[in-house]
Amino acid sequence: MAVSKKSRKSEPSAAFTAADGLVLDQSEIMRAMLAAQKGKQKEESEGNDESDEEDDDVSNEGEDEGESSGSEAESSVAAQRNLKRRRSLSFELDAEGEEDKENEESEPRPQPSSGAGMLSRTALATKDMTPKPRSKPQPNGLASASKPSADVTFESLGLSHPLITALASINIKKPTEIQAACVEPILSGRDCIGGAKTGSGKTMAFALPIVERIARDPFGVWAVVLTPTRELAYQLSEQFLVIGKPLGLTTATIVGGMDMMKQAQELEARPHIIVATPGRLCDLLRSGGVGPGKLSRVRTLVLDEADRMLTPSFAPELAYLFSQIPAKRQTCLFTATVSEAIMELANKEPPAGKQRPFVYRVASDTLTVSNLKQKYLFIPSQIRDPYLLYILQNPLEDIDVALRVDPKKAKAREREAALGKKGKKPRQAKEEEDAPSVPSTVIFTQRCATAHLLHLLLNSLDIPSVPLHSHLTQPQRLLSLARFRAHEVPVLVTTDVGSRGLDIPEVAMVINWDCPRRSDDYVHRVGRTARAGRGGVAVTIITERDTELVKIIEDEVNVRLEELKLDEDKVLEGLNKVSLARRMATMEMHDSGFGERQATNKAKQIKRMKRDAAAAGKA
């Protein structure tokens, strides 16, 4: 929701300020976000034609899936320049918290400069695929990552015995590198910027010192944690609850898609910690449903996935929240991908008499963990379906057998739930007894319609799956995540709403159905596997339109993807079966009215934009 000019003028000029005088200047943050606004608006206009086509007919999903035509192809040089310009931009989320908006309406994919329509299997192999080192400017005088000494313990970091006991109950006995580096500075009240690889323990790096400080001087509301997605907000709340409940701490989760009245009551109860998406928290504070001054005593503000939060999409909401939270507070920014906006804050000269914030950055040039096997599959876009089925039914050797889910067990659970006879063992059909073991897999797509169609397609092929995208209700989304976490189904098909921060420890494989358009998106997607020291495999499907994209990603992530070679004859044996399943899934999706919901959501968004524009004009 946009903030009117009048209301912005009346809001105090808040600053990111630590309790001991350390400062992160808010005006610099807002300038960094708004500087990208012009580029973002141009990006949105480029995606309008594509998004209109996406909603016309679901039955055309399998042919183009949002890809641009050959006449709109960009040169390879232009593609690299445009993508690098957009590195600091993030796809939008719904500003009011009513729904998340993925980048399904993002810009067309850059095309190979040759303009060739047919796929050449040697085209990618002949390119210079040697990754170039990332250029990572270090802030002057700021800390970078270093391996903690062997004698670093939670006790030596200053945590109390009850909190250490709570950690031991969830089998956390030794701090990770980012925890060893950041816990003490945050505990002492310093502002902190933390950047580390996915699965490195960033959440506990700020959660532990916050819980410890609240336990020493408890009152509500002490801390506000802002996240870009609803699912991440629920996950953070669960982690705060696990370590904070033994100490008597309370947490409220404020996200869109849930009962606002109940959330208002939770805020009135003054919980110690609020975990929220910016849009819904702003709505509650502006609506008058809660009393004034609910955030007037906040000591700590955390922006999780800060690279995504510090974009123009969230600027109005953050500006309003800054005006509601005290200027003298501790501020922590955490992310797996340190954007230019964050680096500007880290490098900025502090005001006279002030110190810089504590900054932790991973020392490696490579943004992905070493125990992650990263592969690419170079195939024509028209035959992705049979390749997907083959990969799921014939798991790669790099995947641990222990991380595979038996489809017949998943089918049995579904029948038990349907019949309501949990104590009775259901009969197994012969085809289920012979079903292959499917690895625990997350499949990422660019669009909601693609994710839902693949979910229906896999179910038609007797591979149980659940969808996760913004066109589902919030209870449906939470149920999908719960079933996948509990290993009831082996496959989660999601848009980028599932790429940020979600911690599902036993994911064996990530498949990028659509090649990510930005290197940051790639890092967050593949980070759903190989977490906490475990192994994992990431397979990115590259079509004839993605050759320039994958080269840019390799250069910026500083890793070379290994080609995955499969027996094409064996793969295409299932082509007829998969084609029939796709037709059935398309009809089911059409009958369910999925396209109507899509059109309704878009109409609501247009209406909100017109309303906000009219309000800004009157002001």
Swiss-Prot record:
Its EC number is 3.6.4.13. A motif (Q motif) lies at residues 152-180. InterPro entries: DEAD/DEAH_box_helicase_dom, DEAD_box_RNA_helicase, Helicase_ATP-bd, Helicase_C-like, P-loop_NTPase, RNA-helicase_DEAD-box_CS, RNA_helicase_DEAD_Q_motif. The keyword Cell cycle does not apply. Residues 1-147, 414-436 are annotated as: Disordered. It comes from the Eukaryota. The keyword Hydrolase applies. ATP binds at residues 196-203. Residues 183-356 form the Helicase ATP-binding domain. Pfam families: DEAD (PF00270), Helicase_C (PF00271). Belongs to the DEAD box helicase family. DDX49/DBP8 subfamily. This is ATP-dependent RNA helicase DBP8. It comes from Cryptococcus neoformans var. neoformans serotype D (strain JEC21 / ATCC MYA-565).
